[in-house]
Amino acid sequence: MSRDGHLRPPRLGLLNYMLKALESDGAKDVVFIPVGINYDRVLEDRSLVRSLDPEAERRSTGFALKKTFGFIGHNLALMIRGRWFRFGYACVNFGAPVSARAWIEENDVSDEAARQKSVDALGRHLMHSVGRVVPVLPVSLIATVFARRGGEPISELDLKVAAHALQTELEEKKARIYVPHADTDYALSVGLRMLTLRHLIIEKDGLFTVGLDEMPVLQYYANAIAHYFEPLEGPE
């Protein structure tokens, strides 16, 4: 989980260490399993986004405890009144395994320069593999529509039309899209509801817009699938 929601670069130093170890006789193979995870709700999302601002005032332990107990109390009150909703969906996908030994056999690691080049290529390949299996969830889909529009007000109908078009674009890119109950309209409604309940999205006069100062948090969820629309280095 990154602080801004984006996929992060691989740790090449660790990969280099692994490949070096595999060059010794009798060393066991290392197999990488690409894992893509996404969440409709990350409990510490505001804290993660806030940590990116170097000028943000540091919060005290007392403030953190107050917010935690306030969060628990608020959700208990919603449960008692029958107005509590789940925090959305979490989804995980697995990609094709990548054998480090097979990678060594197929790539030149005869000297330090060649090994470093191979490590760089392996890192790109692994992150490409992870990116291809990151699931697209309702909140990320809706958040992306708002992020692309810069927070401009939009009706629910136009929002869903834009989200449908975005989903079609993602399907063409062979993205793993999770559609609860196999109902796209329901999925989009759930994503919108999640964001409005948290006041990240505000409804007024039949139009939805981004809440005051909430675009960074909304962008955090859009960033989870942003790599599908950017060039991914690695083999297809």
Q: Predicted regions: what is each one?
A:
Residues 1-236:
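Membrane-interfacial terminal anchoring regions of lipid-handling membrane enzymes
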